[in-house]
């Protein structure tokens, strides 16, 4: 990775990430006070090693100062002294600042690990960060950040998809890290904004945990990104936002597909579905991770309600 700020597992072998998603701040800020208070409280209670913003940090359409707005969101992590990484959502660059310029807002920020990514592939903000071992200079895990775009061409409609050149880039990065790890895939996570179509599949075909109060708003085109993740064998879990009142997760072909918990108050939500954040904890040397929710009222949700596909029942074994 090109960044000189190296992430590392703690001496106890853990690494904790807080995922904030769909903050939807704007530069007037009036409706974001409870959002920022929530974020500050989560960081104070969880003391993570990294904050990841999985898109729609701002509602940029009509905002005269979108760069200021997006900086105000990530400043919450800066004030807490915690490094952060960003992927853009479909609402972050709908106004006067284009996507390429918006991701570069974080260049030179001492707390930002965000990268614009290769100029010769689709999207802005495709990059990978490695976590060094607690007592080693070798990578112990990897975090992939992928730009899922915004909107599909009008003749297709709906949302954008992760492009083939981005998938090829991921495969190249994964291959290199696997070779560096003695031929064994490096335990990894992937973060992007718009869920891939397999989020619908896992809900309909497997036992999931958590809520689905709206349809999965994935692209109409399945470009094969999830297939590549399965084939490479390194990514253990994916984390998205986009659908504000979904927070479920389920495992499909060995990969846990996870929604975050929508964080922002300046956007749609649901009565009785508090804003919050998803917490992710890696353990050095293990191909596994723990995850839980921390909600606005301080509740920590370790076990989410199970959902079974139609016609299935829980085993009593």
List PLM regions with ranges:
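Extended active-site neighborhood of metal-dependent phosphoesterases/phosphodiesterases
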Residues: 2-9, 69-183, 278-283
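Active-site-proximal beta-strand elements of phosphoester/diester hydrolases
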Residues: 14-27, 140-150, 191, 255-262
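Acidic/histidine-rich helix-loop elements
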Residues: 21-36, 58-68, 94, 153-161, ...
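Divalent metal-coordination and catalytic microenvironments
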Residues: 22, 39, 51, 56, ...
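His/acidic metal-ligating clusters that form di-metal
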Residues: 47-50, 142-144, 156-247, 315-316
């Amino acid at each position: 990775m090109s960044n000189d700020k190296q992430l590392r597992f703690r001496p106890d072998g853990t690494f904790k990430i807080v995922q904030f998603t769909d903050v939807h701040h704007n530069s007037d800020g009036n409706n974001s006070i409870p959002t920022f208070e929530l974020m500050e409280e989560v960081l104070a209670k969880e003391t993570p090693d990294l904050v990841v913003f999985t898109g729609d940090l701002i509602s940029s359409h009509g905002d005269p100062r979108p760069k200021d707005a997006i900086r105000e969101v990530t400043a919450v992590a800066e004030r807490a002294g915690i490094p952060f990484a960003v992927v853009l959502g479909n609402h972050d660059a709908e106004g006067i600042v284009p996507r390429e310029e918006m991701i570069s807002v974080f260049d030179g920020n001492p707390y930002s690990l965000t990268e614009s990514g290769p100029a010769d592939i689709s999207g802005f903000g495709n990059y990978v960060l490695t976590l060094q071992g607690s007592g080693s200079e070798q990578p112990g895990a990897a975090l992939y950040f992928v730009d899922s775009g915004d909107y599909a061409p009008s003749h297709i409609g709906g949302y954008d998809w992760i492009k083939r050149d981005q998938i090829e880039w991921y495969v190249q990065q994964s291959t290199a890290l696997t070779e560096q790890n003695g031929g064994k895939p490096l335990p990894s996570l992937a973060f992007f904004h718009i869920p891939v179509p397999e989020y619908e599949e896992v809900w309909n075909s497997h036992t999931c945990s958590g809520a689905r109060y709206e349809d999965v708003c994935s692209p109409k085109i399945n470009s094969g990104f999830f297939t590549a993740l399965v084939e490479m064998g390194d990514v253990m879990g994916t984390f998205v936002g986009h659908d504000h009142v979904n927070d479920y997760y389920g495992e499909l072909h060995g990969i846990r597909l996870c929604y975050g918990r929508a964080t922002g108050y300046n956007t749609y939500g649901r009565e009785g579905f508090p804003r919050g954040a998803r917490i992710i904890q890696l353990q050095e040397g293990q191909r596994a991770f723990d995850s839980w929710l921390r909600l606005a009222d301080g509740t920590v949700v370790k076990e989410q309600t199970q959902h079974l596909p139609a016609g299935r029942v829980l085993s009593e074994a």
